[in-house]
Each structure stands twice: as structure tokens, then as C-alpha cells.
Amino acid sequence: MAAIRPSSCYAADAPPISNAHVAALEADDYVVIDGLFPNVDELRAALDDAQYRKTMQSEAIRTDRVRWVTEEDGVVGDTVRALKGLGDRFAPAVGYECVDAPSKCMVARYEQGGYRTHLDHDPPSDDDLYWLWKSSREQSGRVLTAILYLTDPDFDACLHGGCLRLFLGCTDGDASGETATSIRDVEPVPGRLVVFKSRRVPHAVLDTSRRRLALSCWHLAPEA
């Protein structure tokens, strides 16, 4: 059964991450890496027709449908393990000797629309959702976000939109991006991995007009 475990448990499954990648995350709050996951077509085929559900948030905030996957999910399971193992390498860039891997990862599918600016560590404003967030370490404990894009090979951000917009250099606690000193739009190129600091980088998914598929993993601060 899937459970929260130290990311080091999956270190052997992680793709090779260089010291330069770790240094870039530490200095810039994000890093973009291409070519680490050669099995994108296989993953897309396994996830494209799966059942997805609405989130608990309003479609005025986000329009994606999601499903959760674990290391026990067939073809996808190996990639889930690989994403969980990334935390062991990147932990020093977010100020920890080690971080914990979540029990599950999230697949987000957009047919159209996007996701308003937010922090992955930001509590929701709705009271009921806030208490759910507060009681869930897998939400309130996030320190590191890793996103693997599984878009179609001919997805073109210039035509279809769907970029991940990162608001960089923000003051602590800014979930809106208003204090950003720079903005970076990352195209959802298939096989591209984006890693950023969950508590430092407000971000948004810009509107897409074509199906956009991504697999996300949130690493957690270790329990005190």
C-alpha cells in the first residue's frame, strides 16, 4: 500500500540529476530539464483515456480534471518511483538534508482553460477546504514541486497556449505573483521536467485550447 516514505527509498529509481541542476534550483528557485524520461509516449497512452475527476475547486480557478497514481499503477508506476526519487537529490536546494516522498502523484488533464496563479503550499480561502489542507501533510507539507509533461508531440504552445508561468523573486508569502521581479513561461514540451520550490514560486497554467497532460509530484518537509 502506498505511503509517505523518505525520498531516499526511491533514490535508485531516479534519473540522473547533475550538480548543476541542483545549483540552478537553489539559486533560481526552479530548473527545467529535458530528455530524462524517454517513455513519454507509453505514459501518455496509459493515461490519456483513464478516468479523471473534477477537483474540489471552482472552475473559475482551475479547469483541469485529475486522477491520482501510485508506484503500483503498472506502466506509470516506474515513473512515479522515479519522480519520488528526485527529492533525494534536490533536498539540499530547499534547505533539507532529506525530504519525504508523497504516497501518490497527480495526473492533470486540461481540455481547455487553465489554472489561476497560486502557490502549491498556499492554503485555500474556503474554510472547509482550509481544514482539509491543514490536516493533510501531503498538502500543507509541500516544499518541492516536480512536473513531467506528457503532451502530444505536435503540441505547440505558440498555437495552443498552455505554458506554465512562473513568478520569480517574490517576497515570502506572496501567492499572487505581484511582487515578482521576473516571469518565466515554460512550454509544456513532452518529456520536459520542471522542478521548483513549492513555497517560493507562485505559478499559473495559461489557457490552453488543446489537451494538455502532466504528471506532478510534491515532496514534503520531513517530520520534526
Summary of predicted features, one role per range:
Residues 4-94, 106:
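Non-heme Fe(II)/2-oxoglutarate
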Residues 24-26, 137-142, 187:
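Extracellular/periplasmic catalytic domains that process cell-envelope and extracellular macromolecules
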Residues 107-110, 126-156, 219:
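Short, conserved beta-strand element in jelly-roll/cupin
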Residues 142, 151-224:
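Catalytic core of Fe(II)/2-oxoglutarate
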